[in-house]
Amino acid sequence: MLTITAIKAFNDNYIWVLQQQPHTQVYVVDPGDASVVIDYLEANQLTLAGILLTHHHNDHTGGVAELQAYSQNRLTVYGPDNEKIEGITHPLNATAQPRFILDYMSGELQVLDVPGHTAGHIAYVIADALFCGDTLFSAGCGRLFEGTPAQMLNSLQQLAQLPADTRVYCAHEYTLSNLKFALAVNPNNRALQDYNERAVALRRQDKATIPSTIALERAINPFLRASDTEIVDSIKQHFSDLNHANLDELGGFTLLRQWKDNF
C-alpha cells in the first residue's frame, strides 16, 4: 500500500513523503527544507531513497544538498532536464521517458510536462496520486513567472483530463485565499460554496485541505472553468474597459490570471 504523508515547511509549503508499505525506504517531493525532512525520517525510522523535484524554485529545492549530505547512500534525485537545479542525478524528459519505475515502489511513475509557472515545470503521477508542484492548486493555479498563459492553460487542461478520482497533492496550502477569488468570479457555484465551508472548517482545526481531487477541481476551480458562462460574465464585468467581442477561452484565462494576480 502506498502511503502519502505531508511534512509542513515554511509558512505554507507541503513536502510529500511517499512510502510503499512494508518498505522503510521513502521518497520526498520538493524538499525545500531539509531539517523537517530529517526530523521526520528519524522520528519514524525511515531511510530516504530519493527525491522528486517539480521545478527550480528554492522553496522546493533548497533542502536537496543537505539531504544528499545526510544520506548514507547516494540519493537518486529526479527533476526536469531543462531547468538549472543543483543535485539532480536523473534529469527527466517527459517526451523521452514518460514512465519509469522507482525502487521500493509498486507501479510506474508517470512524468508530465506542465510548463507555465516555470518554463520546465513537471508533475508526477503514481497510482491515483498527482504531485503537481505549483501548477495546479486547490481552487487555483500557479503564477506565470516564466511561462505563457497558453502554456499554463494547456498544462491545466492536461491535468484536468486525469481520472476523476486522482488525488491532487499540490505544494502549498493556498486553498482559502484561492477560494475567496473563486467565489468572487463564480459566486453562484453551489459546489464551490460547499467546498469553501468545508475548507474553512478544516483550517480552523489546523488541518490540511490537501489532497483535493481532479473531480473536485473540475467542479470548483475557475482556472479549469474559464469558459463557464458566469465566469466569463464576471471577467467581462471586471474588465469592462476592454473589447470582449472575440473573447475565447485563452483570452478569458489570461484575464482571469491577471485578475487573480491583483486580487
Curated annotation (Swiss-Prot):
Zn(2+) 1 binds at residues 55, 57, 117, 134. Zn(2+) 2 binds at residues 59-60, 134, 172. Signal peptide: none annotated. Coiled coil: none annotated. It catalyses: an S-(2-hydroxyacyl)glutathione + H2O = a 2-hydroxy carboxylate + glutathione + H(+). Binds 2 Zn(2+) ions per subunit. Pathway: Secondary metabolite metabolism; methylglyoxal degradation; (R)-lactate from methylglyoxal: step 2/2. Pfam families: HAGH_C, Lactamase_B. GO terms for molecular function: hydroxyacylglutathione hydrolase activity; metal ion binding. InterPro entries: Clx_II_MBL (IPR035680), Glyoxalase_II_hydrolase (IPR050110), HAGH_C (IPR032282), Hydroxyacylglutathione_Hdrlase (IPR017782), Metallo-B-lactamas (IPR001279), RibonucZ/Hydroxyglut_hydro (IPR036866). Belongs to the metallo-beta-lactamase superfamily. Glyoxalase II family. PANTHER family: HYDROXYACYLGLUTATHIONE HYDROLASE, HYDROXYACYLGLUTATHIONE HYDROLASE GLOB. NCBIfam families: GSH_gloB (TIGR03413). Monomer. This is Hydroxyacylglutathione hydrolase.
